[in-house]
């Protein structure tokens, strides 16, 4: 009893002494301190401040300048590999200094470069060789040392060429450095060189890589720019190594044909990233892993690596790779996810940490001392959307902890502290799922203590994270539970292995006390004591002087908060010493307890514990520089946690390892078996696991045939997929999937990983920006608009104007992505309220704010941003619907309808834009329409249809597009449901007058037309025509459709040539040479289930696929086969019996087919551009594949199948991502100087041997080898016109009011006469001249030169009454010509006189030249001039004599011949010159155009010479000259034509072919004799081939 009493007295007295204890604190004042560093296991400190570097050997008690200290030190680092004695300092000029004796002495390292040229250099030391140094220097041409510009120095895989990096190595302690050169560096003027960056292959002393200690890995990168745009770069990255310190270097052979983009060295692995596509800097990347530094294997990842920043890659305690992925977008936002590998490093899985898992930032940290413990900090989109009136992002921050190496995760549980008030938290801390600790993002937890941890954070559900609510928390159980230490944020540090803790508020008034203080605890944070400082300070740093937290000394660096206006803020430096705590008492063995990690659970087959001081013990450990010792107890029983899934298996939602068929065939068991299947154990024991009684795991028989090349990923949805769409960009393969019941899902990798977008409300509509491909808009039912500008990497939340959502689409500005129009309903209690009306609102800041644009507007367009040459860039068109009368008006404005508000058309039905034109439908009469067109927004002109269609009641029309400078237009001529068809028309260049191309083109009830224009190939169009339209028009027969094709933009049409044999090599049941009865017919656009599907690909030049049949007419789809063409539709072949859906990939290098409307368990594919086909079996039950899609550019190697379960109709959907990226071993090689030299070849398309289309020969670059893939190689940039061809009939089309006759010629519409000059000149009074039409006009796309001229390129003629102006316009200006002639005449006269004087007159005159001379000695030749003149005179005399003699001879001969002919044919009379011209040369002129280009050439030249050759019989006088195309119908002129000389009337010609007995006629042939008397002997096949 006495002993107990004495013990109590002693304990009480000891507590009194302890309570009175205060640490020893010293303060010094000096210049601003930037940084303090401590050597490990030492009392030596280094301090960098404004006036240099200082050293302390007594834990900061005293400071001095080190011996040989460099001046101007701006940074000092303790060497991470030699922390006890080595440090590196860097001066402002970039010079490195080294100490190897804890700062006592310093020496400079040799400088490998001129520091003025470089922005930044860093130095690496070798963990095992103290004399090895590696220096990396970054050079940025446009940035200077110390620049404030921010750059991402670590992200070398981005291929951003603004900065270059160079590496230098030393093996003699830094006495000299050698630059490491790449073995494949080939600089050129168009190369953006990224430089060489290197790393030692030994990462640390813990490295398990068996590679040489001298081995250095390096990366050399460059970008070659080929064309003047942002997308035609070829990136080149090389991985090489040196093992002799830069004397030689060798490329890693495994990557010599690949494009390396980055590499990283870890303790157990080396990672190498390669670009899948060297022509796309945002390309998907592949990860290669090596565990020995030499042999690399391709890793399998659950997602696509694309433009990733992998900074922070590390390994956990099991050697597994932790791969945080950060995707940076255009607006500097990031998205991230964390991948973790298995122990091999080859199979990764996504670390599922949050329900949303759509993180903006994520950090994963593994503890070095707490085995199995990992922390994760995550930021994701806020779960419940909030909008505070400003355009900020709301983030949801979550903190997680795991005690079993990431197998399971939990929130950080908060427990109540008896020292703090109960209402401290706004949520129930017992509900840990919704009320937990969320630590400050990125705050690293110290782990040098035995489970005693501190952090800053907030308590809640993570949706509200603010500095205002930040508190300081402490844990004594390794993070399982946390309690509040301080209700405000503090800096903190540990000493004596956690038995001494110092904390200091960031601000002195945090505790409502303006004076500064720090707090300390001697019982592991249970109680705290305050130490008041003399002056108020702002602490900048609080550290323990021993990095392992074993010491008892601390340092505080701070700024003074008291100063006058003239004195700059002072700097205070405090040292704190706890050596005298508990009177120096050292803890005995009884004062310790065993603390078990993970609550005593087995971790990797063992229980781990530390021995630590009991919390209330009145002593300190005082074991300076001694690290914690971990105790291990082996566990007997093994559990599933001791195992990981084998390669090729992954855990399902129940934690069971199931086969993952994507990587399974690459498992070691499958690779060794060589068979179609192998037995594989689903689980394997974790490396280093020590549990004794292993689980009995039965092997499973798994297939090994699937997946060797094609990888398949399956996702299941418990709801019908009702919408899916890709973003049309090269950056990634992002798509949005909208389900009927489960909301919206987002995938960035073509559906491999699908994440639900959950803003806390239903999404009712999704709209993609049609002009800016990274933008999309998701409408919430509450009135919020979720805007993404980076393909769903992040969202901004906008508040829509307070109105009812009407479901009208957004209208976008073509040039400004932040400007768009939203339509909302005002005064709408419900949609049928009389006062409910639409209002158009406009935003110009991406949805941050909206302003009212116009009442009652239901459709607006930013017209000024659409046209090539707009009348005003700010022009807006709006369709306004008056609420009462329901009248619709087209209005325009150039100032957002503030002051400028014009009525363009009083009454319209609607309008649309085609990209180049705006077309408005205007009501006309009863149930009739008229079309008005504008090309610049200045004026809408009525579209003039051919005269034979003006009587047609225009009840409906469809605008089909305007890609080639003309509007294609379908005018419905019969619209009875089920019997619809109409005329296909094509406009002139301004869209105001149309010519008819076909009369009965098929359409359906919804206005869709069987019209398909092939992208990337000029002028190729497919249509379906109603062959029996006369009977369909009377509803006596169903439609009989025939397919037709044109290769010259609609001028000539032909039936599609059928293949000679089917896919089974059998002949068809008709003669394929008779196209009228036996041609290929394809189902068209009107039958497409998805209007986005096309028969072609814009990137697969010449490739077409369609469902159809060979015969006289198109058959139902279930009786059809699937056909394929590689030459733009000229020839076809059957590839599959039955109807299939299709999709192109890799520019046509990969084609995938899936059965249509039938159950299937396989797909069919071709990897040789349609030459051969193979099948691939889908695992599982058969499904209905509803659609197959890929990125809009058809350049990817991944396809997405949308399928529905066969057992559930419409209720359950699954997706399959089919990945062909492993099919090809390499990417095709493309040399810009000789693009057709290696894997590519030029191909030409065309219907004849000349290969001419649109007047030129054009070549397309296409893949020629099938063992490589194209990627985003800029093939379209190499498309070239090799030459322009001579014009032929195929380069012309019929002019306005002309139609093509059966013989192929263009004739006037029946009942019309050619327009006279009054028709043209009267309509446009300002005209002075006009041109005579021929009925033809040149196709706008044609570039032909010379050859046939059918388009009326004749001499201009004057308008009536404008003869004077015409002569002035074309008359010759006499004065310039007169003076020119006068000067020439005078010069000639002088020369002639000189020759006459010196050569004729002086030698006796002209008479002397007629004499017979014996010699020429008597000619006067005193000099060379005389000789030359005499020679000229003699030559002229001889030439004149020869001409005169020839004339005399010819005259005699002609006279004799005429006399003989008159004798022989005296009784025959010949035609006059007039009759010869008109009858014999021009009879049957149109015959010359039918199928004979040579004859057409003759006719063209004749037209060019003759002008007019048609004569009216009735009035015996020449008609007015015909004008070219006009917007008015060509009617008979009522004006009196100018009189012309009459001719004799004649009888019309009866025969189309002159004979010997035909009577000659002196009159020209009649106007339309072709239609009546000419027989065309060429069939339509010939016409189509012209």
Swiss-Prot record:
- Pfam families named among the record's database cross-references: Sortilin-Vps10, Sortilin_C
Gene3D superfamilies assigned to the protein according to its UniProt record, in alphabetical order: 2.120.10.10, 3.30.60.270, YVTN repeat-like/Quinoprotein amine dehydrogenase
Check the record and name the InterPro entries matching this protein: Sortilin_C, Sortilin_N, VPS10, VPS10-sortilin, WD40/YVTN_repeat-like_dom_sf
**SUPFAM superfamilies, sorted:** Oligoxyloglucan reducing end-specific cellobiohydrolase
Give the residue range of the signal peptide.
1-18
Q: Which CDD domains match?
A: Sialidase_non-viral
The primary location reported for this protein is: Golgi
Keyword Protein transport part of the UniProt annotation: yes
Function of the protein: Functions as a sorting receptor in the Golgi compartment required for the intracellular sorting and delivery of soluble vacuolar proteins, like carboxypeptidase Y (CPY) and proteinase A. Executes multiple rounds of sorting by cycling between the late Golgi and a prevacuolar endosome-like compartment.
Q: Which family does it belong to?
A: Belongs to the VPS10-related sortilin family.
Indicate what this protein is called per its UniProt record: Vacuolar protein sorting/targeting protein 10
Q: Which gene encodes it?
A: VPS10
